[in-house]
Design a protein with these regions (language model features):
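N-terminal helix-loop segment corresponding to the beta1-alpha1 unit
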Residues: 1-139
Length: 140
């Protein structure tokens, strides 16, 4: 496969991010989906449903609590060996977690960092979550 030598860390949720990263997986990249622990022991996504299976096919997964010291340290170990990282977090969240581009490039200068956002990384709406339904109504 053309991308079999590439390791991608997937920190995306919803649809746009997982769809984009799925393309890497479909072309043979080693994609590791980094998932947060289930809130209150409840898994949000139906892992056996067709939508989840379609979005996350050909990906491996690990559950890490990036808010904990141990989870954050394990994540940084993954970053050291990664080629690409893709996330779709609000800018304030990734900075608070210490997983923004500026921080991670200190650990891995060759890391290609992709960030999806509905309203940009800064500006008046930079910290707002952005999903297709919200952006579609933005003109109203």
């Amino acid at each position: 496969m053309p991308l079999s030598h590439i390791r991608v860390l997937d920190l995306t949720l919803a649809r746009a991010g997982p769809t984009a990263v799925r393309q890497f997986a479909d072309w043979g990249a080693d994609v590791i989906r980094v998932e947060p622990p289930a809130a209150g022991g409840v898994v949000i996504d139906d892992r056996h449903g067709p939508d989840f299976q379609n979005l996350h096919r050909n990906k491996r997964a690990i559950t890490l609590d990036l808010k904990s010291d141990a989870g954050h340290a394990l994540f940084l170990d993954l970053v050291r060996d990664a080629d690409v990282l893709i996330e779709n977090m609000r800018s304030d969240v990734k900075h608070r977690l210490g997983i923004d581009y500026e921080t991670l490039r200190e650990i891995n200068p060759r890391l290609v960092y992709g960030s999806l956002s509905g309203f940009g990384q800064d500006g008046p709406y930079g910290t707002r979550p952005g999903m297709d339904q919200e952006i579609g109504r933005a003109h109203v």
